[in-house]
Amino acid sequence: MDFLTNLRFTEGISEPYIEIFEQPRQRGTRFRYKCEGRSAGSIPGEHSTDNNKTFPSIQILNYFGKVKIRTTLVTKNEPYKPHPHDLVGKGCRDGYYEAEFGPERQVLSFQNLGIQCVKKKDLKESISLRISKKINPFNVPEEQLHNIDEYDLNVVRLCFQAFLPDEHGNYTLALPPLISNPIYDNRAPNTAELRICRVNKNCGSVKGGDEIFLLCDKVQKDDIEVRFVLGNWEAKGSFSQADVHRQVAIVFRTPPFLGDITEPITVKMQLRRPSDQAVSEPVDFRYLPDEEDPSGNKAKRQRSTLAWQKPIQDCGSAVTERPKAAPIPTVNPEGKLKKEPNMFSPTLMLPGLGTLSSSQMYPACSQMPTQPAQLGPGKQDTLHSCWQQLYSPSPSASSLLSLHSHSSFTAEVPQPGAQGSSSLPAYNPLNWPDEKNSSFYRNFGNTHGMGAALVSAAGMQSVSSSSIVQGTHQASATTASIMTMPRTPGEVPFLRQQVGYRS
């Protein structure tokens, strides 16, 4: 078969060439050591996603037929020397990939290519292997290949070579090699993909100066910056190398915005590596207008006011009206004081004597400022018959008082009828505690008070004490006690204290 019959040239184009259909992803691929004992994985394509995985691929233009493809690793910078790292995967041997493809495949994809890195002590051995296998796409002099210090072990490129068959069917016609974009080791901080993992806040003052804590993948503290971008405006966050913590955290302060704003403005915040101008995926950052109350005290007061107003509104508008004070009713003083019966009213009324004015008996009583209260309802017992015989209306009040000034006793005073009346109620004998006391008072009355001398002192004390004890258990309007009639007007207050007088 003639060699020219295997070539299908397009009109106007004399030679076939290689074109990269999809570039490999530059960042995100991890170079693995052989000692890790696991697959190096596959190099993803630049358009690969989690749901739709793609891989690096090429196509041969201006040619239709069989072709042999060789893929190797070369250095990032010119001259492109064979790299000491190895390509591993299906179809790989001695650190490179080689396979034949028929005319039915227009696009050639490489799905199982991984990168395996070598140790520094094995670099010379790896380069010697490349030379022995004639893996030198750009024919770099051998002397330059042994310069180990010039190799960057954190970045490689894919080199695609295509060999077409000659008239004997041997793949001896080589097309010009083509290199891909650089592929960076994801473990190396100076070449790894930049990525913002998390920030503690995504907004700040338009004046800048807000402290931001940013978590990221590994970065070089002397080769990283935080950039804020909006259109043609660009600013950088302020931080030093000491603010980069273990290559995975950056503490910086935001730059001020271009000018004053009246509403929030959203800008883009991203990491950038100055050495290769690599940038991360941006995140949103909002600049807020300058607040007159940065501490938020005004907002707190408003929230507190609203918290009180809501329950009041729920209860109704009537609650908010202040109730009017009701007038204080006039209370009769008699309603607040407990009235006790007074044994000595302004007009003293004694049975059998008629009505005696207190001013006649005790002239000093008329000067008392407080008038005694009237007797309340209660049990009213009349005097014994001896008192009716002793105190007739004929004797004067003065002779009666002089006669019984030293030996007398008090009984319960009946409620007087009309003012100035001398009539006595119906006779009702006293309820004496026992027969002994009853006979004593009866004898006392028959002798006109002189019978008291015939009674012993012990008997008098027993009679008096029993009368007092019995009297305390009667109704509140009664008063039973043994007392001495006052001899002088000055003894009236003492008498009132003895009978329980209350103003």
From Swiss-Prot:
Q: Which domain of life is it from?
A: Viruses
**In what residue span(s) does the RHD domain sit?**
16-305
- First-listed, main subcellular location of the protein, grouped into a coarse class: host cell
Q: Where is this motif: Nuclear localization signal?
A: 298-303
Q: Which GO terms describe its biological process?
A: canonical NF-kappaB signal transduction; cellular response to stress; innate immune response; non-canonical NF-kappaB signal transduction; positive regulation of transcription by RNA polymerase II; response to cytokine
Q: What is the protein's known function?
A: This transforming protein appears to have a protein-kinase activity.
The protein, known as? Transforming protein rel polyprotein
Gene that specifies this protein = V-REL
